[in-house]
Amino acid sequence: MRHLTRRQLLAHGAQFGCTAATLAMPAMSFGVGEWGEIPSGVWDTPPNTRILEIHLLGGMAPFESFYFRPASGLRTRGFDSEVAALNWNPSPAVCSGSPPGPLPAPPPSPPIASQFLANDENGKAVHLGPFAAKLWPAHIRNRTRVVVLRHDLMPHEAAIPYVMTGLRIGRPTQASLGAAIQQRFRALDESAGLPIRTAPYSYGLLPQDAGLNSLLFSTMGQLGAHDGSAKPLVLRVGPLFSTFISQLGRPGMTPSADALLDNLRAQYRDWLRLQGAATPAAPARSKAFRDYDLAAANLFNAPSLASFFQTLPQTIVNGAGCAAENLPFTTGANTTEAALKAAVFLLTRPAPLGARYVQVVDSGISKFAGLPYDVHTVRNATDTGSNLWNTLSTLMSMVRDPANPTPQDADKLDLSNTLIAINTEFGRTPFKSLGNSPSAASSGRDHWPDAFCSVMIGGPIATPKVLGSISDAANLNAVADISYTPTDLRAAQLLAMNVDPFEAENYQLGALSAPFAGAANHTAGMVALRQKFFD
């Protein structure tokens, strides 16, 4: 037992009157209640959104894709010849819609193909480049926002948690976006008196062949200060998934053991009821026991969850890379395709099974040490082109086109209620580099957190914009001169889910960058986020 000093005893005694008065009040709920509620006035019409997030693993340069400048010398930042000379796989089954052969050579021949998106915040024209051609169609492009980001973390191991959570390593509230979303929707269920839902609201889908697997697994399921029931379910895509399914059947457990555990839980729950709360529905006072109680309830429901997961698309096919500087094309297990199909399946299920948030890691077809976009010294054009094309091609085949309805639309993403978020941990040098210095002998790019891009498509976004700007200066001076932080972006994405980003478990208003941190209060901060990222 810890003994109080006289000073501590007096301090505690000064608080006792308030505490006693509180305990004498009628019983109140210690549950999550309406956690995450957005104040009125932030949205004219609150969005009813779900999020599919894709993390491009390894750090991807935006210059051939999301931030393509059409001016000579700026198009691909040193890789015009390699991009123009790429061989594109002619097989429609492998690389649907890819160019039929090498792209047009750079000037004096016709320029590399691209599509205007919008002017950035410095008034410069930004195009979607050849590697992002799957985003060119009007029903996609007109609902696309490119956000220029910047931070100062060079290692993957530090940058990935920062970008995925919006907080740096060491912060006790560092949590997956899915944790906040799951806590919010479980709070709404509880407020409505609905039974505990078997299926999670938030998932992470992590290919087994992705590099840094343990780091990704822990980050995608990071709980921070949220309730234990808010933890996203992270599933590995690959052979381990079938092992997980078999474990959900709880082999070896007996009904009598379950009954005993259920009885013991009920007894302990009764001991923890609030003063005067006799109704069975009254929540327990202990947050830790409450988390345990919900976990045990989910454990009992595991076999029914196994039945649901057995319907999840699980087929992993061997695919071929779409682009190659030198033939033959790379081949490999297309776990990204499998993960994306599973994600869309989870997001399009009817209630009460449909997910609200699914995060997918893009493990690529053309991989280097399991990090598909980590193109140090070699293969920038091949690996970035092949991997991004594979991801965007698979994704866009599962997005509805309002002008061309199909019988399969019920199982496709509807951009009116789905926000697609494409992120990466940092960018890559805006020049051919060796050891982060310009080098004409290199055919790759090194880490560059000074300027990179995230993309959001659909949801509350109705017009194309480029937020931020990357300088046109050469080499080491090509940094983001107007930029946002991963914290800004994560707060905005919670807002798109109609979740208060400034709940204590989420972000502090003052931790955001200047355009938002200076807001007079939380409501004004949310309005500023909405106006910048979604209006």
Where are these regions (language model features)?
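Ligand-binding pockets and gating/stacking loops
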Residues: 2-535
